[in-house]
C-alpha cells in the first residue's frame, strides 16, 4: 500500500532551506510514529510530498489514522501506483478502479500532471471522463458538485489512482519550533491550548499543579498522555507534577480574600518559570481567555505576567467558551474535561477584577516563599511514556488478569466511537460497555456482587481508572489484559 503525504501550504511558501528542514523533520516524525505499526515501512521525502510505503495490509487503517494526526500534514492520498503507456491505458485503469463507485452517480475527473508528456491535464480529464461516461450507462458527468470526483495524478510514466483523500490537522511539524511548557489542569481550556501549540510545531511539555486529591492528578495524567499519544508521540516530553497544597494553604492563611486568585496565578507562573528554566524551555502556555474569570482581565493578566521574564503564550485569549468546547470535542478531550474532578482550593468571595500592583506586592510580603521553592524542588518529573509504567507500579494492589472466573464481567471502558468501530466480544463471559468518562458517576449503579475486569485497548486507561475506583472504595475491580 502507498500513501502520498501533502504538505501544509505554509510550509511550501518557506525559503528553500527552511522548506527542506521542515520536510526533513516531518519525515522523521512520520517514521517515529509509524514504526510502532510496521518497522519495515519506507518513508521517502520529495520536494512536494512525502511517500509512505508499507507491506502489512492489516495495518492500513491504523497507519492512515495515525497520519491524519501528525502536525504538518495537509492531507493524505491513499493511492495505487501503476505504470501506463498512453491516455487510453489511463482510461482503462481508471475504469477498473472506479466503475463500481460511479454506478448511478454523477462524477467529474480531476487530473494533476508532473513531467513531460504529449498531452495536458485537461486532455486526460476529457478523455477519461468521456470514456467513463460511455462505458458506465448509469453514470453521468457533472462538473460542479458531483457525487464522486475521480482524482488521478500522472507523474512521468506512473499513474496514481487515488483511492481516497483524508484531511490532516495541518500546522507545522513538531520540532520546527522551540519547546513550550503547558500549565495543564485537565479542563477544556488547557487541553485545547496544548493541542494548538503542538499543531504549530512546538514540543509541548506539561506542568500540573495539584491543589489536592490523587484523583485529580490521575485525571490530568490521562489528558496529557492522551494528547501526547494522539498528536505528539513523535517526540519525548516531560510531565511535571507539583504538589501545590502547601502554597494554597499559605495563601488561605495569610493573603487577603480579594487578592487570592491573582496571587495564586502569580505563584503558579513563578513555579512554572523555574521549571521551564531548569529544562531549557522557552515559553509557558496557558488556556486563559480574556474576561472568562476574574483573574483573566487585562489588568490582572498583566500583573500575572510581571512576575516572570518567561514568555507566556495564550492561544485562546480571544476565544469564547463555546468555541473552546467545540475544539475540545474535535480533538477528543471533551469527555475528559467534563468528568475532571474539581479542586478549587482558593475561592475568593469577592475577587478583584482590577488588582493594584502595590496591594498585590504588599500581600505577597506576607507569603513565605521558601514554601514555593520547596514544592518546585520536590516536583515529580516523569517521561510521559512512563506514565503507563508508573501507573502499573501504583496499582500493585489492583490485580491484572488474563483469564476470568464465573463471577467476572468484562467492563469495556473505551469511548463510544471506539466501541462501535471495534466491538469487544469474548467467548464465555459477559461484556458490558461503560465509557471511562462515566465510571465516576455510573460504576456504583453496576452489580457490586460481581467482579469487574476493566479493559481498554492499550491498558493505560484501564489501570488509571482501576486506581481511581479503588480510591473511591470499590474493591471489586481488576485489570483485564488477555
Swiss-Prot record:
Pathway per the UniProt entry: Cofactor biosynthesis; thiamine diphosphate biosynthesis
Protein name per its UniProtKB record: tRNA sulfurtransferase
Residues annotated as domain Rhodanese: 404-482
Record bears the keyword rRNA-binding: no
Superkingdom, taxonomy of origin: Bacteria
Chief subcellular location: cytoplasm
Keyword set, alphabetical order: ATP-binding, Cytoplasm, Disulfide bond, Nucleotide-binding, Redox-active center, RNA-binding, Thiamine biosynthesis, Transferase, tRNA-binding
Family label: Belongs to the ThiI family.
